[in-house]
């Protein structure tokens, strides 16, 4: 395997938004077995180092392709678009206002009579929006509307971050 291979090439899958998760998982397990550093323990230092680098690349590729957000960023980067998380924010005012409202709702969950129900309701709405954003990204990417896909990616980042915050709050509430 070439260390310079793109992530889709590593997993022998087509470059596309839609990834067959079972195929990705199966190929990952196969590559892990083939390039696990322990298999190279009796080899020379160069081979050991290459095995570690290859295993690291395989892990990075897998984590990127299995995550909708990371996969979207990677697809845009393959099109020479800087999709790093700090590179953009959305200019959609209505979307940004909704994000503020959702964060206020999140901050008030602890004060709710049933914080777990409030959190679940919030999660359901955010997951629905995130799913819609992923569908939008897929359509925009497939139609080569990369600027629009880039803007949708910014929205996906907001939603993914909010979902992480919801999970963190849920863990905090369970620990109380």
Q: Where are the language model's segments positioned?
A:
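C-terminal accessory/regulatory regions appended to core domains
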Residues: 1-176
């Amino acid at each position: 395997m070439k260390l310079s291979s793109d992530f889709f090439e590593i997993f022998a899958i087509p470059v596309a938004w839609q990834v067959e998760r079972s195929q990705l998982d199966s190929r990952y397990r196969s590559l892990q077995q083939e390039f696990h550093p322990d298999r190279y323990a009796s080899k020379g230092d160069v081979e050991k180092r290459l095995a570690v680098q290859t295993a690291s690349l395989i892990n990075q590729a897998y984590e990127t392709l299995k995550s909708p957000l990371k996969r979207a960023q990677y697809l845009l980067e393959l099109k020479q678009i800087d999709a790093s998380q700090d590179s953009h924010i959305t200019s959609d005012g209505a979307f940004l206002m909704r994000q503020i409202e959702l964060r206020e709702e999140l901050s008030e969950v602890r004060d709710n009579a049933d914080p777990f129900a409030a959190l679940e309701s919030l999660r359901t709405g955010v997951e629905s929006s995130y799913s819609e954003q992923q569908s939008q990204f897929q359509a925009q990417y497939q139609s080569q509307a990369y600027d629009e896909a880039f803007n949708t990616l910014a929205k996906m980042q907001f939603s993914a971050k909010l979902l992480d915050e919801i999970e963190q709050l849920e863990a905090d509430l369970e620990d109380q």
